[in-house]
């Protein structure tokens, strides 16, 4: 069965917002999972493995939350894989889940990514002191900005490539009623006029701190 095709059978999302004080972390992820199972016509019994995407644990202040949340995610007695690739964790989670199906190892995989940043403080979580980070005081943006500049230099991409991506993403987000931000009038000029944070990254290229699961 190696090399078999992978497909999305169903999806489920919560409303993304600054604070979801009406649910716990378990309740938040279960809300999205229940919707995905209903959309796919599946039950937990149909799931062979669970892949959970989660960025830094400091965003919620709970280390390895996937372990105590296993019951809520229907992962009891099943393989549970944690994916953490920082800002790309949402896409990486889908890639890992698809690869498990394509390899023939599992038939149905539940992929779920989430954050509940209101439980902690994202600015603190991205600016933690030693021994967790090198004592340079750069923060997440300070580490990523040189990579963006290097990409622009190597590829010949325009210096405003990040702003172009932000406009595309904001316009797509405006079509999703569950999205945190709705900016249907966003333009390249508006993004370029926003505050410079870490050259060449501007404020309107960054994401909000959100509670949500998918």
Where are these regions (language model features)?
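Conserved phosphate-binding catalytic cores of ATP/NTP-utilizing and phosphoryl-transfer enzymes
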Residues: 91-99
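Hydrophobic or amphipathic alpha-helical targeting/insertion segments
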Residues: 98-112
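Glycine-rich anion/phosphate-binding loops
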Residues: 27, 88-92
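Conserved "HGTGT" condensation-loop signature of ketosynthase/thiolase-family condensing enzymes
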Residues: 1-82, 103, 113-214
């Amino acid at each position: 069965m190696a090399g078999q095709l992978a497909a999305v059978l169903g999806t489920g999302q919560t409303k993304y917002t600054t604070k979801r004080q009406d649910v716990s972390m378990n309740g938040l992820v279960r809300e999205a999972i229940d919707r995905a199972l209903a959309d796919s016509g599946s039950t937990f019994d149909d799931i062979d493995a669970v892949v959970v995407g989660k960025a830094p644990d400091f965003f919620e202040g709970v280390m390895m939350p996937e372990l105590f949340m296993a019951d809520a995610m229907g992962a009891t007695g099943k393989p549970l894989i944690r994916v953490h690739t920082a800002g790309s964790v949402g896409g990486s989670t889908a890639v890992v889940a698809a690869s498990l199906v394509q390899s023939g190892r599992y038939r149905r995989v539940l992929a779920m990514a989430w954050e509940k940043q209101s439980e902690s403080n994202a600015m603190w979580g991205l600016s933690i002191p030693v021994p967790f980070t090198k004592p340079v005081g750069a923060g997440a943006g300070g580490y990523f900005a040189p990579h963006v500049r290097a990409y622009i230099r190597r590829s010949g991409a325009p210096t405003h490539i990040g702003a172009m991506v932000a406009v595309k993403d904001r316009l797509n987000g405006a079509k999703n009623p569950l999205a945190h931000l709705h900016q249907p009038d966003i333009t390249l000029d508006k993004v370029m006029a926003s505050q410079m944070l870490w050259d060449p990254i501007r404020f309107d290229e960054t994401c909000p701190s959100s509670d949500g699961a998918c």
